[in-house]
């Protein structure tokens, strides 16, 4: 068991850290040689936008929402402890999943839109982007499992 105040502090710290990482993910847009504003207009470039929003929703807003959920559990139901293993599994799965999905979708979108911008056919662009498909899907799956562990932890805390 772990004190719920510790869980709230950890989730809040991670949401601030993820906000900083989200700002860092925006820096490549400011480098003119990478041509991000042009590449986003090509069809694979939307993967870069999706990757960024997945990270924002899962890692920044998601961690803030979990901070709020655990805070409500503490204040409204006066629950003092939750399961330590479920909390750590939730944090690890959410963080790794968000980073994995974001990095590989961003990378695949950049490679694909660069190829499309240089005039390659859609078939070739699709083949070039295949490397990012499985890791991106794995990241999304880890995000879902992390949220499932959080929900399970809330339910188990209510029952005790």
Could you describe each region identified by the protein language model?
Residues 1-4:
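Short, Lys/Arg-rich, polar N-terminal cytosolic tail immediately upstream
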Residues 10-36, 46-77, 85-125, 129-158:
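Hydrophobic cores of alpha-helical transmembrane segments in multi-pass integral membrane proteins
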């Amino acid at each position: 068991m772990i004190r719920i105040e510790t869980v709230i502090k950890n989730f809040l710290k991670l949401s601030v850290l993820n906000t900083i990482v989200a700002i860092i993910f925006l820096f490549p847009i400011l480098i003119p040689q990478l041509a991000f504003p042009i590449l986003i207009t090509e069809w694979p470039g939307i993967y870069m936008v999706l990757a960024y929003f997945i990270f924002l929703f899962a890692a920044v807003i998601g961690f803030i929402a979990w901070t709020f959920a655990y805070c409500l559990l503490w204040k409204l139901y006066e629950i003092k402890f939750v399961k330590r293993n479920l909390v750590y599994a939730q944090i690890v799965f959410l963080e790794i999943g968000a980073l994995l999905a974001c990095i590989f979708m961003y990378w695949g979108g950049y490679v694909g839109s660069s190829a499309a911008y240089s005039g390659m056919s859609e078939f070739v662009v699709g083949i070039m982007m295949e490397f990012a498909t499985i890791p991106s899907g794995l990241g999304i799956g880890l995000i879902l499992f992390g949220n499932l562990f959080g929900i399970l932890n809330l339910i188990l805390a209510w029952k005790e």
